[in-house]
Amino acid sequence: MFPRNAWYVACMPDEVADKPLGRQICGEPMVFYRNAEGAVVALEDFCPHRGAPLSLGFVRDGTLVCGYHGLEMGCQGKATGMPGQRVNGFPSIRSYPVIERYGFVWVWPGDASQADAVKLHHLEWAESSEWAYGGGLYHIRCDYRLMIDNLMDLTHETYVHANSIGQKEIDEAAPKTVAEGDTVRTSRFMENVDAPPFWKMALRGNGLADDVPVDRWQICHFTPPSHVLIEVGVAHAGHGGYHAPADKKASSIVVDFITPETETSIWYFWGMARNFRPDDAALTASIREGQGKIFSEDLEMLERQQQNLLRWPERNLLKLNIDAGGVMSRRVIDRLVAQERAQTGAPRAGAPRAGAPRAEVTRDIPVRTAT
């Protein structure tokens, strides 16, 4: 169950070079390649001749050529040539709107007539020379909503990431969750605490002492269809915390673009953008390595959680106050999916999707809607 009329990250630009890239997104097999002008093209990964995956072919002079019998496909999904054949009557395949922007390739898997670049959220950190970014990609076998749950409730850091970013004060700081239209924000602030190992490294990277108490913050922003950006940082205690001057803190944005592959697998584009010492390539590499290790710690937990949910779909799950961010984000997703079904006349699902429990028990969820 995914919103389809939305922009999803399909790949990194360097993944689409001289060869076609096959990738399934929202349950739809797609092939990405660059045309003669260097622009990224997305087509259905299906040759109309014999059904072979076009991603197993090659690109010749900006034209996608099927690797089975040499059928050539145009950018709009129409066959343009084939050795010894007339292709005018060949059936077309689907093409998808694509945008290359902010260091990512984005694809619109839904109604192409509704695709609009204006609907792509502006990412200031991706365009400004005052910011540096480093990230990567993981393939994870879990429902994309489990990843959203994980990122909108950072209480798990105390346990899953105990040796990097976790600390007991995260448990002790009550989160505050606010819904504003289709966005959800969960905030948590900690004062006068010790910085965990990752943030000690970040403080040193910004030329700051790492052996003094700090104020720490985590502000998680969910935006449809499945994007989570998290403002994180630490500041020397007593200087204003989140609002501390730049020479007293180390702050960043954790970037999480979650693209469903199937109902139980995702492409997870992760990274961190920072606005201190953006020209320090060694620091960018060090932070990227640290973030990669941190995110890798979630993989086994999420995949084993997915296996349990598939094995026991009738089990009731609790929803506690710490789960409010994920709960509210799921409500946004449910609403958008329902709206799309109403527009297309598609029937409503009569049963939970794979990996989703049939019922949940709600307890202690303070959720506030902004007006």
What are these regions (language model features)?
Residues 2, 7-132, 365-371:
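Rieske [2Fe-2S] iron-sulfur-binding domain
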Residues 39, 116-371:
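C-terminal catalytic domain of Rieske-type non-heme iron oxygenases
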